[in-house]
């Protein structure tokens, strides 16, 4: 009887005196679960990327076996992985993208993640120029054009991220690949519209309508200079606009008030998104 009372007393003390300990234990357990999930996610991503790299090696062998000095396209399914791992689709496109040199663009995709690589084919030697990995249902595509008006073709990977609140057409722009040795680096642009004859880029930033900016950049060789930003004027609830050189640094001395958007912005892709606001969108500003 005495032992039962003592045991009950210990249990009561434990319940009354350890809410902080219980909270800490709960937090530790929660952190452990999160960490385990992150480890599984990281491990799965690494496995997926390694499998895509294996498929890329197979694609290079296909090119070595089948490319005979002329434009060539080929699409096939790589071997299926274990369990429920999906087929990997391989898309190969070999062309003279730049002058007289053949390049190969290869996509390896498991329908969730995509690995993209660009190779220069020089006397049967495959030189890797770029390699980009796109996770989580991001579907990239490529385009070739003169972005900065220097009469030299540029290469771009375009994609729309699978997460985020607002319009976000992303360009990875690789300037003048034919003029550069080794791996290429890119300039990242969001919602751009290119005006190569003017050596300009006009576009829309990232954010909600009414709070997102228009921008204008000028090419200086392969560098970009910021010329101006335009934002809806909060004071007039978007009926007029403010123009300045600094996005968040407008001052009364430097800002220019506009009663309407300049005509030069009317051809910006997605302009309707920039203008898709009402007076209510400024009520909390």
Q: PLM ranges: what are they?
A:
Residues 9-17:
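Hydrophobic h-region of N-terminal signal peptides that target proteins for export
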Residues 16-98, 198-285:
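Acidic, small-residue rich beta-repeat scaffolds with periodic aromatic anchors
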Residues 76-80, 127-134, 181-185:
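A short beta-strand motif characteristic of beta-propeller blades
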Residues 97-105, 148-159, 199-203:
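Acidic/hydrophobic-patterned starts of short beta strands in beta-sheet-rich repeat architectures
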Residues 109-113, 164-169, 209-212:
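Short, solvent-exposed loop/turn segments at conserved positions within beta-propeller repeat blades
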Residues 118-122, 166-185, 216-221:
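Beta-propeller blade repeat segments, especially FG-GAP/WD-type strand-to-loop junctions
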Residues 137-143, 187-194, 237-239:
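Repeated scaffold domains used in trafficking and secretory/extracellular systems
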Residues 146-148, 282:
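Calcium-coordinating acidic loop motifs
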């Amino acid at each position: 009887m005495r032992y039962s009372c003592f045991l009950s007393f210990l249990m009561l003390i434990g319940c009354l005196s350890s809410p902080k300990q219980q909270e800490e234990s709960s937090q530790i357990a929660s952190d452990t679960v999160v960490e385990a999930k992150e480890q599984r996610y990281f491990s799965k991503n690494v496995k997926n990327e390694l499998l895509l790299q294996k498929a890329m090696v197979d694609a290079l062998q296909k090119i070595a076996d089948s490319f005979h000095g002329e434009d060539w396209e080929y699409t096939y399914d790589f071997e299926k992985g274990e369990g429920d791992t999906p087929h990997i689709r391989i898309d190969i496109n070999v062309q003279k993208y730049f002058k007289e040199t053949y390049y190969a663009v290869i996509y390896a995709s498991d329908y969730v993640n995509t690995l993209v690589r660009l190779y220069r084919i020089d006397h049967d030697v495959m030189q890797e120029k770029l390699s980009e990995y796109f996770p989580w249902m991001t579907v990239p595509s490529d385009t070739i054009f003169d972005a900065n008006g220097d009469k030299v073709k540029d290469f771009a990977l375009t994609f729309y991220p699978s997460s985020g609140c607002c319009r976000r057409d992303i360009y990875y722009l690789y300037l003048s690949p034919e003029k550069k040795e080794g791996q290429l680096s890119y300039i990242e642009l969001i919602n751009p519209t290119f005006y190569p004859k003017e050596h300009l880029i006009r576009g829309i930033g990232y954010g909600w309508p009414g709070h997102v900016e228009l921008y204008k950049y000028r090419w200086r060789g392969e560098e970009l200079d910021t010329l101006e930003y335009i934002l809806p004027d909060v004071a007039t609830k978007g009926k007029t606009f403010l123009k300045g050189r600094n996005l968040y640094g407008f001052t009364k001395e430097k800002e220019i008030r506009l009663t309407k958007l300049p005509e030069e912005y009317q051809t910006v892709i997605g302009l309707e998104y920039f203008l898709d606001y009402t007076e209510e969108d400024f009520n909390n500003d």
